[in-house]
Amino acid sequence: LWHAVWPRMRPGDFRVNSADGVGADWPLDYAELAPFYARVERQFGVSGLAGDPNFPAEIDFPLPPLPLGDGGWRVARAQARLGWHWWPHPCAIHSAPYDGRHACVQRGTCQQGCNEGAKASTDLTHWPKAIAAGARLVTGARVRRLETDAKGRGIGATWLDADGHGHFEPARVTVLAANA
């Protein structure tokens, strides 16, 4: 289920082996990825509150945070009494009108679908713009393999359509999103 919770990895998450001797360090660091986090947060219209001391100070979300509501405030007060740090989590749900879509009306039906279009998803944020720019959306397809040239560079993808027929789609750039 897509809850629209919008986490960022922290700088230390990229170097767990160096810091803690477990796992593997990433081949890139937070600073390299940060501009892309910000870009996608703008594309989706993320609501959040800047200033969380667990994250770098430069984070600034395109929309203010969603209201916590009575239950959220109850949890926040309980955590504060225990001395725990709490912060409203960023969400890809619009707290105000954004990019032609409406704000959340706090109906609480997020999992059944958002009639206002306030809960961001690629069918609202990216597909319409890509199709308007000439992209073709193929549904019911499954990529079998990313194809490479003799030097190992991606040249396209072999995929199956809904009827099981194989196709090859050449591409200048290939991306393995891995359900991202």
Describe each PLM feature range.
Residues 176-180:
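Flavin (primarily FAD) binding-site architecture
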Residues 145-169, 174:
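Conserved beta-strand-loop-beta-strand element in the redox core of flavoprotein oxidoreductases
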Residues 2-5, 13-143:
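Conserved redox-cofactor binding core of oxidoreductases
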